Amino acid sequence: MNTIIDASNDAKYRKYQDAIRKCIALFQTVEQWPDYISFLTKLHKVLQTHSSFVNIPCSLLVSRALAECLSPGLPSGVHKKTLEVYDYIFTIIGSKTLTNELSTWSYGLTPFFSISSIKTKHDYINIIKKHYVSLGVGIRPCFQAVFISLLSGLEEDVDESSQEVYHLLDDLVKVLNDEKFAWGCIWSTILSFPSQRPGALAYLLRVCNNLAEEDIQTRVIQPDSGLVVRSFAAAISDNDILVQRGYMDALLNYFPIQSTFYKDVKPFDLKLLHMSVASIVLRNDLSLNRRFYAWLMGLSKDTELSISDSSITVDENTLQQNMAIFFEGVKDLLSSKNSLMSFYKAFRILYALSDRRPLFTIVESQILPCVLHSYETLTNVFHRDDSKHLYESAVDHGRRLIMKFSDSELHTFLFHCVNKIVANTTENSDSAEAVKFILDSQNFFFESINTEYSFIIFTNLLMHLEKTSPNSDVDGVSMTILTICKILLNNFDWNFFNYNNSAIDSYAKCTLNLDSDFENGILTYEILYKKCKCSLLSLLKQYIKDSHVHHEVLLISLNLIKEASDTEFENEFLDLSLQGFKDNSWSFQTLGSFVKQLPSRILINSTACVNVILDRIWCELCMFSYFREEELLSVIWTLQEKLQTRIIESYFSTCIVKEQLELRAPTIYYTPFYNLLKKSAQQSLFHFVFDRPLLLLLNSLLEDESGRDYTAMMNWINASSSLQLRVLELMTENLLSLSPNLTSVNSLETAMTRYNINEDQRNSEASRCVYFLKLCTRIISYFQDLHPKEGRLKSAKQVEELCLVTWADALLIQKKSLTYSSFLAFLVKLCLDIVLTPQNIKTSTDVYIIQTWALRLLYQITSIWENPLKFESSLIVGLFALVQEVERSPSSTYRSFILSLLQMLEFLLSRLDGTIDLSSEQHYLLSNFVLVGMLNDDPGLSPKWLHAIKKLLPLLLQNLQLLMVNPIQSLCKFVHSFLDQHESMYLKYPDPVKDYACMDVFIAKLKMLSELVSAALLEFTYSPGPKKSNLEANGIIGNVISGVFAAESSGVSIDVNKRLSMLLTMQDALQTLFLSYSWHIRSSYADKTSKVFMNDSSVLKEASLSGLKEFYFCEPLECVETLVQIYLENNVECCQCIWDIFSFLSDSEPQYIVKQLVSSFFAREGIASYAGPSSLTAKITQLDILCCMSDFVSRVEGENTSKIFTEISKFVREIISSSNSFKNYLLVCLRMLLEVAKNVNTYCESRQQKDFIDLMGKTLSSVLFHAGKSSDPNLTVDFLAYHKAAADTFEVAKTQKKTSSVYLFVKYLDPSLLDFFCSEFVPKITELSKEEDKLVAWATSIVNVFITPLVKARTFPESLTTYHLDLLLVLSKHPFLSKSWRRDFWEIFNDNSLFRFDIDQLRKLSPVIYTALYQEISRLNDLITKSDLGVTTLFTSRDTQLGARQSNICRITILMLSSPRDFFLPSLPPLIDLVKRLITSDPEGVLKKDLFLFIRALALRTSSKHLLPLWPIVVSELLIIFKSYCMPNVAISKETLLDACRLLDFLTALKLEEFALHEWVVMLSPLDAVYWSGKTSRKSLVQKVSERLQEQASEKDDKSSVESEHSILTSTTRTPSLGIYTTDAQLRNFLNRISIDAYEESYSFSTIDIQSFENSIYREVLQRFSNAPLSPFSSIKAPSSLAGSSN
């Protein structure tokens, strides 16, 4: 691009111009700083020689050179000489020309004062005083820049130059002749320039000190009070505490809270100021806090600091006015329900304010409801783990804040809430909850509990309830009110108010409007007490139908009776209660509370009350209420403890007698009263309450009336062991300790009882024995003619039931002495006939009873003989048949029959020692017996049946298929069914006892399953012969390979078919045990309410592990292989159970599991030649085994690592020795080694560590040898698609394990390896070895396989997948590995294909770029050198060289964006020099766009203060472009103009302080644009550009773009306004609004969106090298040479 040339025909002027050009060219050849002085001197001489010319030629170039000479990096001598040249130029051009060319000459001079030394400050001041002050109003465009530059000289008042600066500033303001604009500049400086706030404060205080108090606000509050307020808010929020103190002092002394100008400020701005002032308490600085309090109170700073709080008196109305806005601001914070920080901030501010009571009392009453509501919300809603500390701090400060509120305010708030409740307003529910919340924490919130207020509120609420008719609408509020009343009960004593004639508190009386409820006169506490009693009695009558409210009122009434001695109320309450219980209008819940809370003295003195209570209890019993039994017993025991008499016992006895007399039928034994006796048998008070009723029942039992039915009574006694104990205690006076010493009889020949009974002795023992003797006699006489006569079955039932409570030896007792061989023989024959020929019994109803009796009697008789009898063997078979022949029934009689049968069977089996031979038909009977027992779920029967089956194991093993397989399979089905239906079973059995019982049955069957399978496996264990002695395991696969199941296995000593059958059965059983072990995961039992299933999960797991341990002992390899199959079929959670099982089975020796997995792996190598059953080999593959082994190894920790390493080492060496055959398994081996590595260095010996490193290197080499050989371009795409589909399936169904690279190795070799290296290997590479050289070598080998070929082939970025980028990324996280990838990376980076990457890829590569650059910073110098115009290459075209420079500049830009902030500070000077040379030496402006992008990146990644040398260059270039575009004879492309506008947009949006000092050069002052609409100033340069664009416009304005920009301005974040594609209309709109936008961005306190700024640069860099144009009116294309590589 051509620079601006002054057109003049004057030969002297052309000579002058040439001389200037030569001087300017010298500045581009500077090598050392003395050269600057030399060149400045020559320039000065040229100017002196041609001093007759007012206009200086090439003024923009001269001003740029002078601005560069004022760079902070140059010595003060250069600065002094430069200022001298400036002074001379200003002298020769004069004020008029300087005014016209102010933007040309001032942009380099104005920022200098802040960096100047003492030697040059005076020179600068003289220039401003001499040349700028004289400009008058012409200084307006640069006034703020000059003013800000001078503020840095005011930081030290003691400095002599400071006074000179003060006077100079006053002069500038004076000559400007516009105080409004001047103060606008000052306030905007405070708002937008944090570094200049100290100087601005000093000037502000000086001006205010020199003004009269009444003139300060009229002179200073300009041009807008909102701007002033926001400036103060920004300054008080500054990070520098000294700045905060200074501006708080200014507020205190000159802008007090009562200032009139605040009335003109918008509420939002004023609230912003108040919250900024209030937020200074968060700094925990006492001096700031004092200033805050003083400002709120309207005091001066000195007054507040010198006078104690007690002497400060401020009018309350004034304080209320002062704090009105403050209160609104805090209220806004407290209303932010979703902001935890807002709550914390509000609580902190108010808590700090509470230390100043004069201030706090003003807002106390107003803010209390908000604080309480917010604190309640905080404690009930917020539960954030990620901000736990903030949450706890907010809760703590909130609680402490509420404690700061006075008790009177809290009571006032309570009174108001009570009034709302009583008034039945729409807020009554919220008010009730608020009262409840306060009272719940009253011990924290109140200093002391006011008993009078509590009683008054209590009475008022009761009166309100009395007036409110009960309905569903108020039920919730009523319950809340009653909850409040119960809390208030603890705050006062009834007796205190009973006879208290003192008047109630007048404040409470007025606040609660109690006068309206009582007659005129003095209202005393005694009157309230009486009213309270009446209300309670009324409520008891009123809320009878609402059981909840009624119950709560009853509790309150009982509390009054308990604490107050009020006979009158007691009598009325008892009368009401008795009537309620009599007519059943009061619920049973009320009865329970009534008995528990009523004092004992009332119960003892009121027989009628006790009788009514007992009547209600008996009525409840008669209602057959099963679920009320526990409640009834609780009431009975409570009543007995309070009465301490036998009145309850007498009452129940009377009721029983009445029932017996009235009913005269067996139904008496079915009444719920007997269930009550059964449940209460374990209570210590049983004998005091139930002895006499129990005696009545037993007396009826002992009567010999033929019509009496004893069945129900005997069943009832037998149903509870505790009740049996009570019966025995009652009959025998602790019979357990006085039982008779009966001598057992050994044989029939000598069978003679040696126990003598004296019937004349009437003690309990003798009487009971005689009683049982009579029973035996009746049995003998009765069964003589049993079968033919059905009429006596009823009597037989009675006799049999009575025998249930006899002792075993009692049947053998006769009168004094007696031989009874014939008696026993008769009984045995009788019992055998009943047991073996049940068909002879005609009535099925009683068959179970008769057979049960026969079995029990037979058991007693058989036990007399020591040796087995002949009939016992046939009796066992008969028992098997009996189970099949007898019809099953859910009745209790069938249950008793089975129990007797199992007892007899176990007894006979123990006597015969298993010496029983069964025929095939008898085997069937045995199988049926076993299956029936397996299917039985009765909690009482099943364990005994299973125990009997264990005794039958020797018989079961005789016929494996019939007797073992079917029961095992039925058990497996039972387990599956039980676990699948556990939820429905819980609903079926709500009683915990039944839950436990069912679980006990299940556990017993689970153990039986394990024992059956283990016994069968031990019976058919295979021992390989000599030819197969080298096998390490004998599972199914091992047996297949070894030929055990082949046709030629004739030499095998076991039944192969039986063994095969049992191994397959064991697989099913093992899966069943695993299902039980992992049931707690599948069932999600944690969400259930059943305590049984939760507590029994550990028992279930223990039983399952025990069975698995037995399987593993019998068949270790087969057990492991089956677990591998389960591992493959289940999800991730269940797989964790597999590892737990492996750990349990290995018993701290995990190498055995690894050894068995390895054996299984190699055994499968020969499966292809096997012709046996396919089901034995098709379930799992070798890869499946390795996957399982890898996961298992990953979970081995600690010292166990050294145990498994040997086995893994052998296995891996075997694999890599035949890598071609086992190439599909190399990745799994590598993964296993990686998992072992985490513990090798810690727990293994040094020799193992060396072996590990050697093995890892060989394995990695083997893996990489087979990689990189695929040519399929879609391989990675298919791999990613497979990954995504698998991941989606896992998220939706949760039915399979998370996809691992291991499973994809065979099909997708390269991408699965890359995935493994990125996700597992490289992140853990430091765990593999401590030798960095080894690690670097391994990383290099990986890079050489996956990255280097792509680099050499130049196929990136298309061939660089996300995995390749991830690999570079994870490698870059280990700096010492950079040697492995840096060379390839720099080849990628230096190739122009870099610019074909997308933004996301470049962002992902950012850490890689930064790491590479950090370790080779010299690369940056190389790029700078290659980008310099002075570097050329022989035999290279100009376009190629230009393209190389463009690409290298863009590379530097990418480097800049990839690095952290201020990383390039050491290299900043050469970078800025590069920008200078390229901008000033680029004749066609081709590099402008690239340089502008680089400047944007530099501004984004470098602190603005470090870029001071750069800004003059940038500003001058913008000046040149904009001025040139406005000139008709200079060709500037719109593309270049757009680039310049984007740069200006970027820098103004960043709000860099140092650049903001130069914005006035090209754009209108924001103050002029906002407040004066630009009427007071000349058109800015950007306005002229906009008009020029308008002249050339070929399209209408795009209104939509304007509106979109307005929406951007209202955002809380700042982003660049101009996009990559920008129309003329959008550009004009931007230029017209840039000043206003800049002001609004500062005014609104918006923050920058870093990512948007970065993306804007990335997009334009990448677009620069694409074929698409940058904008619709782009006129310059990237050179064709950009497609080539950089040089």
From Swiss-Prot:
Alphabetically ordered keywords of this record: Golgi apparatus, Membrane, Phosphoprotein, Protein transport, Transport
Highest taxon above the source species: Eukaryota
Pfam families assigned: DOP1_C (PF24598), Dopey_N (PF04118)
Broad class of the protein's primary localization: Golgi
Transport listed as a keyword: yes
ATP-binding keyword on record: no
Modified residues (Phosphoserine): 1671
Membrane disposition: Peripheral membrane protein
A GO-annotated cellular component: trans-Golgi network
Cellular compartments annotated: Golgi apparatus membrane
InterPro entries: DOP1 (IPR040314), DOP1_C (IPR056457), DOP1_N (IPR007249)
One record GO biological process: Golgi to endosome transport
PANTHER family linked: DOPEY-RELATED, PROTEIN DOPEY-1 HOMOLOG
Family membership: Belongs to the DOP1 family.
Protein name: Protein dop1
Gene this protein is translated from: dop1
